[in-house]
Design a protein with these regions (language model features):
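Short alpha-helix boundary/capping segments
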Residues: 58, 129-136, 225-233
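Glycine-rich, phosphate-binding/catalytic loops in enzymes
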Residues: 114-118, 178-180, 210-211
């Protein structure tokens, strides 16, 4: 199939899935998955899995063992951490392309004029927590896979879509755990796209990453009449923060 005709066929399939796209988006936008601590993760992954199955994808859940939650999700209050992976085509076929995004969201905060989990649609826009960062990326993954299947595009390999937790707190229990388990490595993955909320013309390579650490700064006490003999730990803490 010629490239232009192929592109048009896929675009037509995407357009035909507009109602499904909105339904999928509102289905998962309505689930409050605030992190920390990591609310409703099992409910959200179950909803995503339902849509994957509707598309015809093979579905797999990847759970962080309970005994490792304190290590990988120290801010998670012991709540479960689960990723969900969908495979379109033979999961072992190569080459493969893995689209991945996170379903956790930061707390909604204040100042909303709409219900942050009400999925209000106005003037062609969906207003909800996660509609940008970053459940919309997961919606894009699934609609792309669905469009390929609906258009009848033969696959030479596998399209993989995953939804992971905990990006907002470092990702160790999410995409980091998929890497640890071998689901997303240079050996198992030919191509990978992180479906973060950038425009289509801003596909980029790399990520600034994140580090969580705890620093202890020790001062030296002194009498108020002889402050020069003491060491103010706050002064050195400020210097450290300026460097960071």
């Amino acid at each position: 199939m010629e490239r232009e005709k192929l592109t048009q066929t896929i675009n037509d399939a995407v357009e035909s899935l507009r109602e499904e796209l909105v339904a999928l988006a509102c289905d998962i936008f309505a689930i409050p998955t605030q992190n920390p601590p990591g609310n409703n993760y099992l409910e959200c992954t179950a909803a995503i899995a339902k849509w994957m199955e509707r598309i015809g994808m093979e579905v797999e859940f990847v759970d962080v063992p309970e005994e490792r939650l304190a290590e990988l999700a120290p801010h998670g209050e012991g709540l479960p951490r689960r990723s969900v992976i969908g495979y379109l085509g033979d999961r072992n076929a190569r080459p493969n392309i893995h689209f991945t995004g996170h379903y956790d969201v930061v707390p909604e905060g204040t100042g909303w004029s709409t219900d942050p989990y009400g999925c209000e649609i106005r003037d062609g826009n969906i207003y909800a927590r996660g509609s940008a960062d970053q459940k919309s990326g997961i919606v894009s993954e699934l609609i792309a896979a669905w469009a390929l299947k609906k258009a009848g595009i033969p696959l030479k390999g596998t399209v993989i879509a995953s939804a992971t937790p905990d990006e907002e707190s470092g990702g160790q229990a999410g995409v980091g755990y998929l890497v640890e388990r071998g689901y997303l490595t240079k050996e198992s993955t030919d191509y990978c796209v992180i479906t973060e909320c950038l425009d289509v013309d801003k596909v980029c390579i790399g990520h600034r990453g994140t580090l969580w650490f705890e620093v202890h700064i020790t001062g030296k006490q002194s009498h108020g009449s002889m402050p020069s003999e003491g060491v103010n730990a706050l002064v050195f803490a400020q210097k450290l923060m300026n460097v960071i």
